[in-house]
């Protein structure tokens, strides 16, 4: 949710922490092909599958919807060791059961060409850079955006409101939507940080920036 990319050192540290435990890992890797500022995407996305101590206990989750711009299709996958997959299916069959057949055939055919997902880093980095350049002209403080299609900002310099209240005000008064990062904390921890999504047409981003520069 924070547009942070875990490094190899981070993953090794997690592996060390989990090693003496029986904890299972849910590794959400739906943005695996959206990593910025690197020579190649593969050099920076560190999947749990690459670390034996993590792979043995991990449910690795990814999304065809986010990779291929078809989020409305609600199609993804989970990779896990055979013993864990058996248990996963017992639960999953009652939640979803299956994905419709035409969508599965369509994705299988589309995946034959790797170019669409290999082009994602450059595609989204250009949008990120466009959005960040415009935000530099506001009083919002930019936080790093290393991957995904999200940009987090600190609102302390522009408002005393709590994150959720600020997001509601921003939508109502300026017509720009943001997400309060406190929504991702069980206790609603508020750091005065909100998140924008830049997976939009350039004209939409430029319109939003024009409004945000009034803050």
Can you describe what each PLM-predicted range is?
Residues 1-215:
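PLP-dependent class I/II
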């Amino acid at each position: 949710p924070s547009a942070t990319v875990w490094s190899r050192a981070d993953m090794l540290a997690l592996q060390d922490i989990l090693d003496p435990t029986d904890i299972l890992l849910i590794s959400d890797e739906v943005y695996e092909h959206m990593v910025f500022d690197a020579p190649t995407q593969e050099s920076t996305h560190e999947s749990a599958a690459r670390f034996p101590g993590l792979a043995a206990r991990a449910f690795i989750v990814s999304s065809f919807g986010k990779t291929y711009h078809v989020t409305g299709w609600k199609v993804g996958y989970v990779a896990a060791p055979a013993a864990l997959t058996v248990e996963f299916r017992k639960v999953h069959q009652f939640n979803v059961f299956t994905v419709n057949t035409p969508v599965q055939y369509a994705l299988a055919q589309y995946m034959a060409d790797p170019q669409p997902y290999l082009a994602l880093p450059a595609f989204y980095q250009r949008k990120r850079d466009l959005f960040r350049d415009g935000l530099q002209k506001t009083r919002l403080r930019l936080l790093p955006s290393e991957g995904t299609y999200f940009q987090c900002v600190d609102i302390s310099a522009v408002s005393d409101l709590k994150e959720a209240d600020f997001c509601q005000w921003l939508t109502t008064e300026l017509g720009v939507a943001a997400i309060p990062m406190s929504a991702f904390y069980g206790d609603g921890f508020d750091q005065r940080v909100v998140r924008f999504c830049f997976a939009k047409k350039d004209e939409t981003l430029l319109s939003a920036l024009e409004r945000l520069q009034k803050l």
